[in-house]
């Protein structure tokens, strides 16, 4: 597969690993990565989100894990070929059995999920997922630092259940970004950010990716300006 080139790094791709997509770019661009020294990405795939995070937070140390050995190897290669490789590492690891004494300031994930009408290839890959939302949340609650944050991008319909499960695990909603493909359609994704501290108010944001078919919105162009090579 062709590599995907960004301004400051290149992402090599592989047929057995989820390719670079809008979800990952949005998560990498919009997640609050400030003041996070130790960062964990769960389900790194190509390593895209971890690389974007490393670029945005130059003092962070990033661990990226994936249950797919091909993905972990590919991410490791992409890290080494970047300017950020000295503070990044990729591991072939199942999050359910991930052993660590470290507490993370930020745990970030673009978890696998079922689409309503996915392509056959993606449907097969997603149906082989080992990590359920419930497992993702409970494990995160164990290893998140006291003042840490947990940030994910998920399908819009999954939001209420995901938020409820987080609250049951003492992870409280801090920020909700509702993502629309364009202004005339139903919401497509949610970017959710949680902390272990119960918040008095939740930050609510709206994000629209396109102003017309295949024409990015000004909001998207601004959010990704440090990454994409737009003409």
Curated annotation (Swiss-Prot):
Catalysis: reaction(s): adenosine(37) in tRNA1(Val) + S-adenosyl-L-methionine = N(6)-methyladenosine(37) in tRNA1(Val) + S-adenosyl-L-homocysteine + H(+)
Transmembrane segments: none
Pfam families: MTS
InterPro entries: DNA_methylase_N6_adenine_CS, SAM-dependent_MTases_sf, Small_mtfrase_dom, tRNA_Adenine-N(6)_MTase, tRNA_adenine-N6_MeTrfase
Main enzyme class: transferase
Location(s), subcellular: Cytoplasm
GO MF, any single term: tRNA (adenine-N6)-methyltransferase activity
Major localization class: cytoplasm
CDD domains referenced in this protein's UniProt entry, alphabetically: AdoMet_MTases
EC number assigned by the record: 2.1.1.223
SUPFAM superfamilies, per the entry: S-adenosyl-L-methionine-dependent methyltransferases
Keywords: Cytoplasm, Methyltransferase, S-adenosyl-L-methionine, Transferase, tRNA processing
A Gene Ontology biological process term: methylation
Protein origin, superkingdom: Bacteria
HAMAP family from the UniProt entry: tRNA_methyltr_YfiC (MF_01872)
Family as reported in the entry's similarity comment: Belongs to the methyltransferase superfamily. tRNA (adenine-N(6)-)-methyltransferase family.
Protein name as it appears in the record: tRNA1(Val) (adenine(37)-N6)-methyltransferase
Organism: Flavobacteriaceae bacterium (strain 3519-10)
Lineage: Bacteria, Pseudomonadati, Bacteroidota, Flavobacteriia, Flavobacteriales
């Amino acid at each position: 597969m062709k590599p995907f080139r960004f301004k400051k790094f290149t992402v090599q791709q592989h047929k057995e690993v989820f390719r670079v997509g809008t979800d990952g770019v949005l998560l990498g661009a919009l997640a609050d990565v400030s003041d996070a020294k130790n960062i964990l990405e769960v389900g790194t795939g190509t390593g895209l989100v971890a690389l974007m995070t490393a670029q945005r937070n130059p003092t962070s140390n990033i661990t990226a894990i994936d249950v797919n050995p091909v993905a972990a190897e590919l991410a490791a290669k992409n890290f080494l070929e970047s300017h950020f490789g000295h503070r990044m590492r990729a591991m072939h690891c199942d999050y359910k059995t991930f052993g660590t004494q470290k507490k993370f300031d930020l745990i970030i994930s673009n978890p696998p999920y079922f689409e309503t009408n996915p392509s056959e290839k993606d449907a097969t890959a997603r149906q082989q997922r080992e990590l359920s939302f419930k497992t993702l949340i409970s494990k995160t609650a164990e290893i998140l630092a006291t003042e840490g944050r947990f940030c994910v991008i998920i399908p819009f319909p999954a939001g209420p259940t995901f938020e409820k499960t987080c609250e049951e695990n003492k992870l409280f909603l801090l920020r909700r970004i509702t993502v629309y493909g364009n202004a005339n359609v139903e919401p497509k994704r949610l970017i959710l950010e949680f902390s272990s501290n119960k918040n008095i108010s939740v930050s609510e944001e709206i994000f629209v990716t396109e102003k017309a078919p295949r024409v990015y919105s000004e909001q998207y162009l601004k959010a990704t300006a440090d990454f994409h090579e737009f003409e």
